[in-house]
């Protein structure tokens, strides 16, 4: 269980999260997993209209599904549009996702969204160090996504030369978060 001190969005379910990767964080996956109490972070490519329609047609998914955005202006516009369309009373979780969370803009966006939408549970990542975990929490993130480049299908390590062993990252980030 996750009890959020900042909003009424307390999560009670299976502590497994389907990633917002292409082919994983889909509407179909969210519908199927929500029946089992499993959380889904949707992919960032859905439009505001698609998201509004999905959550209108599937209110049960509001309990354990996060809208995902990046840090581009179009992503922020998408978030504002979804919140403005009356869906604001149902959107509880937001995943702010970048492949490598080590930029000043990333922490700034987390802080701006926290100030604008205090009721949201913000999931932010991806990071692999205690310092950035701490920065995101101080900026307003409730949950920090940990991991850069450890997966077998992840291309971040190959394309950017940035990666970190997953267990080491979890240990370091969990220590900083506590």
Enumerate the predicted regions with their spans:
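Active-site entrance/lid segments in N-terminal catalytic domains of soluble metabolic enzymes
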Residues: 1-178
């Amino acid at each position: 269980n996750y009890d959020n001190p900042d909003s009424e969005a307390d999560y009670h379910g299976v502590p497994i999260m389907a990633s917002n990767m292409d082919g994983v964080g889909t509407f179909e996956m969210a519908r199927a997993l929500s029946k089992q109490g499993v959380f889904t972070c949707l992919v960032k490519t859905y439009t505001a209209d698609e998201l509004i329609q999905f959550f209108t047609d599937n209110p049960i998914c509001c309990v354990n599904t996060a809208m995902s955005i990046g840090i581009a202006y179009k992503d922020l516009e998408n978030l504002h549009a979804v919140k403005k369309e009356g869906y604001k009373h149902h959107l509880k979780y937001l995943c702010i996702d970048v492949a490598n969370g080590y930029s000043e803009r990333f922490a700034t966006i987390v802080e701006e969204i926290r100030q604008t939408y205090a009721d949201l549970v913000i999931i932010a990542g991806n990071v692999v160090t205690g310092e950035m975990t701490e920065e995101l929490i101080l900026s307003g993130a409730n949950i920090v996504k940990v991991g850069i480049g450890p997966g077998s299908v992840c291309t971040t390590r190959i394309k950017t030369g940035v990666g970190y062993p997953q267990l080491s990252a979890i240990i370091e980030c969990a220590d900083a978060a506590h």
